[in-house]
Amino acid sequence: MGRPLKAIVTVKLADHGVSARKQWLADMKTEAAISQIYSVSGETDTVVMMNLTDMEEFQELSQRLFAEDENVLQYQSLFVLEQHKFDLAL
């Protein structure tokens, strides 16, 4: 079946303290659907790349990982419509 649905989620955290941030990142790293996590500068704190089986999986994960997490102040989901380049080689 694979994971054909790709989502990019930007996350603003409520608590930027070292221990809260480390715990939140540790929780994210355990999820099979999450392929990449980046701490970034700017209006958001973190960018999470997800590879999902379907929208139902996204809804379950986004509710559990983002909406119900007290340390997540705000999140926005973007879905990949077309992939034009994907190359991880240096």
Question: How does the language model describe each region?
Answer:
Residues M1-L90:
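A compositional/biophysical signature of low hydrophobicity enriched in polar/charged and small residues
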